[in-house]
């Protein structure tokens, strides 16, 4: 193997190992993974956003869980619901990126992977309850706001929909 080709292969392997996404059912998550998920969600939703509301809502067992790791550190997460579980439509939510890992595109990766996962399962349309300040972010992925803004845990939210063919 040529030295240049070998170097390119090594760089590709390092890049591939750096970020990893995994989707698991609730029952397939280890205790350590569940602890890391709840810790990340609490860190952002309760502490950072100063939202003193219960994060654990009894819906995690109904969801599939998308975990994004960088160098074996859980740095981003979302949970994905098939239709007729959280909403009539398929959905994903509790989308979170660790503060120290923002600006790397991980939020976009979570949304793209969630859409891809639901699309592969023929789940259409997708409805999300987006924090209103993130409307442009979700619109960049094709989501369209519908209805009036509402409060969820005292934070302004907007229902947004994505339909694909």
Where would I find each of the regions flagged by the language model?
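N-terminal amphipathic/basic-hydrophobic helices that include classical n-h-c signal peptides
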Residues: 1-17
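Short amphipathic alpha-helix that is part of the acyltransferase structural core
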Residues: 12-65, 69-74
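Conserved beta-strand in the GNAT
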Residues: 67, 73-82, 89-96
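A conserved beta-turn-beta hairpin within the catalytic core of GNAT-like acetyltransferases
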Residues: 82-92, 102, 124, 152-157
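Conserved acetyl-CoA-binding loop-helix of GNAT-fold acetyltransferases
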Residues: 97, 103-116
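Residue-level recognition of the GNAT/N-acetyltransferase active site
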Residues: 98, 131
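Conserved GNAT acetyl-CoA-binding A-motif
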Residues: 118-130
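Conserved catalytic-core motifs of GNAT/GCN5-like acyltransferases
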Residues: 127-129, 139, 144-159
């Amino acid at each position: 193997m040529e030295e240049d080709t070998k170097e390119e292969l090594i760089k590709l392997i390092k890049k591939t190992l750096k970020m990893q996404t995994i989707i698991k059912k609730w029952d397939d998550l280890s205790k350590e993974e569940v602890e890391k998920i709840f810790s990340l969600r609490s860190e952002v939703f309760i502490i950072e956003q100063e939202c003193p509301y219960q994060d654990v809502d009894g819906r995690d067992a109904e969801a599939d869980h998308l975990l994004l790791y960088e160098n074996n550190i859980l740095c981003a997460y979302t949970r994905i619901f098939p239709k007729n579980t959280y909403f009539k439509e398929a959905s994903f939510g509790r989308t979170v990126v660790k503060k120290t890992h923002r600006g790397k595109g991980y939020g976009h990766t979570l949304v793209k992977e969630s859409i891809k996962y639901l699309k592969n399962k023929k789940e259409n349309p997708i409805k999300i309850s987006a924090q209103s300040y993130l409307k442009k972010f979700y619109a960049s992925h094709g989501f369209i706001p519908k209805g009036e803004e509402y409060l969820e845990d005292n934070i302004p939210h907007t229902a947004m929909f994505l339909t694909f063919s």
